[in-house]
Amino acid sequence: MTKHRVVVGLSGGVDSAVTAHLLKQQGHEVVGIFMKNWEDDDDSEYCSSNVDFVDAAAVADVVGIEIEHVNFASEYKDRVFAEFLREYQAGRTPNPDVLCNAEIKFKAFLDHAMRLGAEKIATGHYARVRQNPDTQLFELLKGLDPAKDQSYFLHRLNQAQLSRSMFPVGELKKTEVRRIAEEIGLPNAKKKDSTGICFIGERPFRDFLNRYISKEPGNILDDRNRKLGKHVGLSFYTLGQRSGLGIGGVKEKGAPRGGGDHDPWFVARKELDTNTLRVVQGHDHPWLLSQSLLADQVSWVAGHAPAEGKAYGSKTRYRQPDSPALISGATPEGFRLDFPEPQWAVTPGQSAVLYDGDVCLGGGIIAAVDPH
């Protein structure tokens, strides 16, 4: 194995900690960097950055590597958070983790690491990279642990980024990562996994959004134009949402799915022109099912779109099982996906990602659903 100078992104979590340990064991020259990507809440109960850095520094001490604290908050605010707010204000539901990976962890962080003389960077993502022996192209693969695979969030990475990236824990199950952490005495071996969007932390999402987006209340209507209540603003809801609607509809035990009087309500549409939130009853209501989508902001791992006329695996949300999809009309600006089986709550602003088996091909941002 070729030995490299590798800069590891140490987050304070167990995955990046084991990543650093594995690389050190393999004989690489390893340096740790803690990325501070958000500082608006430094004095808030919701900010874990200071605690995370203490954990990361303790990990570096156990592993036996140096660690540097680097502030990327300005880049994050300009490249990720500003786009996050624009998307919500436009009525879509963005995934900032996808943009953070492309713009911060594998661009700003990568550039910083290269300036330090690194040949590679490594993170604790559950994914894999390999170079195809026939095409010599770098491929992004799913992590071996299907319950933890994070290739969906990495689908915008290009050849230059992948060629310099390493994901050691992508070859392991999460249980193995925890076991290694305990065996070598890592102080964060039992630290719980982080959840949610990094700059929101554990606070209620609506409370956070209130600080940046003004409320524009409007009507909540069902599929028969019956008024059921008022919403606080379309930006605060996402397709498929069930809780927080304030209109009741608790499902009775044994009630049928698909529109019974006692079925729960789900957000089905956001009509921006009339500021109307449309809701329907039943998980399998036709308004929640989609046969096709259009995507823009395209990024293909290989640098070009996959061949048409073949069914690929697809995901329109994280942790969704792969669903067959046919791609057509692919241009540098966008593509269309058609689904043999209807997909539930396909949401504009989220990513549509294609797979050929375990190989992540890339994808785009969902712009329209069931276009005519």
Curated annotation (Swiss-Prot):
Pfam families: tRNA_Me_trans (PF03054), tRNA_Me_trans_C (PF20258), tRNA_Me_trans_M (PF20259). Residues 148-150, 317-318 are annotated as: Interaction with tRNA. Its EC number is 2.8.1.13. Disulfide bonds join 100-198. GO terms for molecular function: ATP binding; tRNA binding; tRNA-uridine 2-sulfurtransferase activity. The active site is at residues 100, 198. Keywords: ATP-binding, Cytoplasm, Disulfide bond, Nucleotide-binding, RNA-binding, Transferase, tRNA processing, tRNA-binding. The record marks 125, 350 as: Interaction with tRNA. InterPro entries: MnmA-like, MnmA-like_C, MnmA-like_central, MnmA-like_central_sf, Rossmann-like_a/b/a_fold. Residues 95-97 are annotated as: Interaction with target base in tRNA. Gene3D superfamilies: Adenine nucleotide alpha hydrolases-like domains, HUPs, Translation factors. HAMAP family: tRNA_thiouridyl_MnmA. Belongs to the MnmA/TRMU family. This is tRNA-specific 2-thiouridylase MnmA. It comes from Delftia acidovorans (strain DSM 14801 / SPH-1).
